[in-house]
Curated annotation (Swiss-Prot):
Catalytic activity, reaction form: Release of an N-terminal dipeptide, Xaa-Yaa-|-Zaa-, from a polypeptide, preferentially when Yaa is Pro, provided Zaa is neither Pro nor hydroxyproline
Location of the protein in the cell: Vacuole membrane
EC main group: hydrolase
One cellular component (GO) term of this entry: vacuolar membrane
Protein name, UniProt field: Probable dipeptidyl-aminopeptidase B
A Pfam family per the record: Peptidase_S9
Bilayer-crossing regions: 110-130
Length: 921
């Protein structure tokens, strides 16, 4: 089987190389076809000579076989063979050797004349082709919705390039930092060539034509330092606000997706020396450490207990004492890290440096899930004698849907009184029905905003706490079931706006994302306890991770939105009274922008992510009197690479299903020929609020499939995905997978009806939620549209996934048992009607447990269903990287798909034993 695949790959490579000369331009097409005829004749002559001398049968593929590998060349190849079946031994095209004597001179003269005419026409067509610049790569041509052909004549995208990151745009992250005296436009640079190891620099000095207001300041001269005879090397650095000290993390060891353990040191900028964070415990595994806003103290968590180190003393103060395996202080447990904070911290300083808010998490009732490691020992511990041959098991407190959640409390610590206290607010959720999703201090006022939801995330409560008075009240309460029946997403974008009467802000307030007429928009709540916002944005579009920044001096709010299109991103500003909205980016040209603003919002790093070659530029914002612009990355190397390669043709369009307009991108192979029949691969993720179709530049595995293998790849963002309004998003609640699968199937039927699509060769693939959607689509479709599917790390029963994520979209299993039954992959009879499908999973997946795949396999076994393949990866988590596993995943997807579209799985389904003639043995 491997040899057969290898042979197909070699033939595919040879034929696509020839086909790269073909173009939709008529002149180019003439040139390419003519040269292809002569090339083929030349190849046959050479092959004939070689094969005759070796006395073997010629190895050209039988007629029609290569249709599976390269349809475009097959079309030309078959047409030529049907017109004339050349006998190579007696061919008039042989110009030397014995057969040349038998060729009639007149015939030979006629052949030379005809050949000369063909060559002359070929040269003329070539000049026309070059004159029209038809050789330009499609990446240089704006996206054309009506485009049917690439004009490239370059190399194919390779798997090695994609896997090696060669198509990844170079991006520079700027760590904006506020100056000790409030200066704006300062950035932190670590490890830049030709500079001290850690410096603070005015961004304007990056452009040699401008002068910054701050001289470069060195925080750490060298990339190493010594403490008690130890040589230490920084992994992470955190300067104090006054820039006099640096908190340095070394010996970092990963924990979960975001969290890690490290040893911490306090580095003095003036003396360039360091001391341990805790002089008594130099080797303590610290989970989190953060500076006081006043630069005079550091709070940290070690072994799930909280501690305080004041710089005025080497003594460490222990804040909590009962932390351990079941109680967490200041750091989240697994599910809060993964699904709520998307980070490792549950500690918040107020601006005055007087108070610390922190989360206490009680996991005592949360069931454990065992993660087994058969090859490695992530704990770093040596096994006990006699247990060397047993796998290491890590027990994780993992609340599955309907199981007990961790209970959380928000506690406060008074620095000066050395006192921990809690503020109780009447009318709150029961502890088992409470999620605390955001904490925002109101500057130095001693007040904090706390965002809470119920367990199913459909009731929101915003609480305002006064820690000085130790009292609080509910300032907003929203039951979304009365609005659109959806859910509240976890958000940490609330921005506090301090009062400034002289600047038109008589009261303090905050900006938050709100639901307005079916879309996510920005609202400004002022005073803080006002439940009715000033509407800052409105319309049939949405804000994205907003606000991005607030310019308090000029009362401006900056944000990114989908105003121009659901699949693009532009940057805007709006005044705090909701007027004068302006674009910061050029909206006359489509673009997918990201933005990172300086601390005072006077400067912004613009990230242009597509559809063209990405670039980065630092500019001053419109309200900044000092106009500044500096390009820091153009990705010229990537641009040159794109010119030399045949990239897929991207066709953006929409489909309307059940009244919903959905975004689609079709990746066509270079040199697309609408007269041919192409196999089609659907790729999806499809998770709630996600987006896969966008105008960002991306050369990925799907690009490789289209460019190298010559298949069409289609992605549709169905119902449930983001940025097309809440009506389309929330319709899936309580029954995830149903509408999403329908949208994939109906879109696939549209493609199957196209003249250039081979409806018998359609496949679908996805990872994680996309793996679930792949199986759900195959189940719903039952072989009617899709013949093949490839699912990586799929959820197969939402009862097995974590509670906070799942119940947000499905309610609890106790509340919605029928919905959970419907969403599970259980109709194995329907799966048996597909030609074949593939499932892959990491054995040590702590996110989507291997339990999902194993229970599906059991259902298939019980029903006697065998039309599938399985590959598991020992010790790999959800990303599947352990011991070269990630490359194996994509190699497997690649080879499995080629075999599918070559018809191998049809032959496998009806296996016939090879008959051997005993007389010839």
């Amino acid at each position: 089987m491997a040899g057969h695949t290898e042979e197909n790959a070699q033939l595919l490579s040879t034929e696509q190389e020839s086909v790269s000369r073909h173009s939709s331009d008529s002149a180019a097409s003439t040139a390419s076809t003519t040269s292809l005829v002569f090339d083929r004749i030349g190849e046959r002559v050479a092959a004939n000579r070689s094969e005759k001398s070796m006395m073997v049968t010629p190895k050209f593929p039988p007629r029609g076989e290569m249709a599976y590998a390269d349809d475009e060349h097959t079309q030309i190849h078959l047409d030529e063979e049907e017109e004339k079946d050349y006998d190579l031994e007696d061919s008039a095209f042989l110009t030397n050797g014995a057969t040349n004597k038998s060729v009639d001179k007149k015939l030979r003269k006629l052949i030379w004349i005809v050949g000369g005419v063909f060559i002359g026409a070929w040269v003329l067509a070539l000049f026309i082709f070059l004159g029209k610049q038809a050789y330009k790569h499609s990446s240089e041509i704006p996206h054309d919705p009506q485009a049917t052909s690439s004009r490239g004549n370059g190399k194919k995208v390779t798997m090695d390039q994609v896997m090696g990151g060669q198509w990844r745009a170079t991006k520079h992250s700027i760590s904006w930092i506020a100056g000790a005296n409030g200066e704006d436009g300062l950035l932190l640079e670590q490890g830049s060539a030709g500079k001290d190891y850690l410096i603070v620099e005015d961004v304007r000095t990056q452009n040699p034509e401008t002068v910054g207001t701050l001289d470069r300041m060195t925080l750490m001269k060298d990339g190493s330092f010594t403490v008690a005879g130890r040589s230490l090397y920084p992994s992470k650095v955190y300067p104090s606000k006054d820039l006099k000290k640096v908190l340095v993390a070394t010996d970092v060891q990963s924990n979960w997706r975001h969290s890690f353990y490290a040893k911490y040191w306090i580095f003095d900028v003036e003396s360039q020396t360091a001391e341990p964070l805790d002089p008594v415990d130099l080797d303590g595994r610290v989970q989190l450490a953060s500076w006081s806003p006043k630069s005079d103290a550091i709070v940290f968590t070690r072994d799930n207990n909280m501690y305080l180190r004041k710089l005025s003393s080497p003594t460490v103060i222990q804040i909590t004492t009962d932390g351990g395996p079941e109680f967490f202080y200041g750091v989240p447990d697994w599910v809060y890290e993964e699904e709520v904070f998307a980070g490792a911290s549950a500690t918040w300083w107020d601006d005055s440096g007087k108070y610390i808010a922190f989360l206490r998490t009680n996991e005592s009732e949360v069931p454990e899930y065992p993660i087994q490691y058969f090859v490695s020992r992530p704990s770093g511990k040596e096994p006990l004698p006699g247990e060397e041959n047993y796998p290491e098991v890590r027990e994780i407190k993992y609340p599955k849907a309907g199981a007990p959640n961790p209970t959380v409390d928000l506690l406060f610590y008074d620095i000066f009184k050395a006192e921990v206290f809690e503020v109780t607010i009447a009318g709150g959720f029961e502890p088992k029905n409470l999620l605390i999703t955001e904490v925002v201090w109101a500057g130095s006022t001693g007040k904090a905003l706390i965002r809470e939801t119920n367990r199913e995330s459909d009731i929101l409560r915003v609480v305002l706490v006064d820690v000085v008075a130790r009292e609080g009240k509910t300032v907003r309460y929203t039951d979304i079931n009365k609005l659109d029946g959806g859910w509240f997403e976890v958000s940490e974008d609330t921005r506090y706006i301090p009062a400034d009467p002289a600047n038109g802000r008589p009261h303090d307030g905050y900006i938050d994302t709100i639901i307005h007429e079916n879309y996510d928009h920005l609202g400004y709540f002022t005073p803080m306890d006002n439940p009715e916002p000033i509407l800052l944005t409105s319309g049939n579009w949405e804000v994205v991770q907003a606000p991005s920044a607030v310019d308090l001096k000029n009362n401006l709010v900056y944000f990114v939105s989908t105003k121009e299109s659901p699949i693009t991103r532009q940057v805007y500003s709006v005044k705090l009274d909701g007027t004068d909205m302006k674009a910061i980016t050029d909206t006359s040209n489509e673009g997918y922008y990201g933005a990172s603003f300086s601390k005072g919002a006077g400067y912004v790093l613009l990230n242009y992510n597509g559809p063209g070659i990405p670039w980065q530029k630092v500019i001053s914002t419109p309200s900044n009197g000092n106009q500044y612009t500096h390009t820091i990355e153009e990705n010229k190397g990537l641009a040159e690479m794109a010119k030399k390669h045949d990239l897929p043709i991207l066709i953006y369009q929409t489909v309307t299903i059940d009244g919903f307009e959905l975004q689609v991108v079709e990746r066509r192979p270079p040199h697309f020929n609408p007269k041919k029949k192409y196999p089609v691969l659907f790729y999806l993720y499809g998770g709630p609020g996600s987006q896969t179709v966008s105008k960002s530049f991306n050369v990925d595995f799907e690009s490789y499939i289209a460019s190298n293998l010559g298949y069409i790849v289609v992605t549709v963002d169905g119902r449930g995905t983001g940025f097309i309004g809440r009506k389309a998003r929330t319709i899936i609640r309580g029954n995830i997978g149903h509408y999403e699968a329908r949208d994939q199937i109906e879109t696939a039927k549209i493609w199957a009806s196209k003249k250039y699509v081979d409806a018998s060769r359609m496949a679908i693939w996805g990872w994680s939620y996309g793996g679930f959607m792949t199986l759900k689509t195959l189940e719903e479709d039952a072989g009617e549209t899709f013949s093949y599917g490839m699912a990586v790390a799929p959820v197969t029963d939402w009862r097995f996934y974590d509670s906070i994520y799942t119940e947000r979209y499905m309610h609890t299993p106790q509340h919605n048992p029928g919905g959970y039954d419907n969403t599970s992959i259980s109709n194995v009879e329907a799966l048996s009607k597909n030609v074949r499908f593939l499932v892959m999973h990491g054995v040590a997946d702590d996110n989507v447990h291997m339990q999902n795949t194993l229970t599906l396999l059991d259902k298939l076994d019980l029903a006697g269903v065998e039309n599938y393949d399985v590959h598991v990866f020992p010790d790999s988590d959800h990303s599947i990287y352990f011991h070269n596993a990630n490359r194996i995943v994509y190699d497997k997807l690649n080879n499995w798909l080629i075999n599918a579209f070559n018809g191998e799985w049809l032959r496998t389904a009806n296996a016939v034993p090879l008959q051997i003639d005993a007389a010839k043995v």
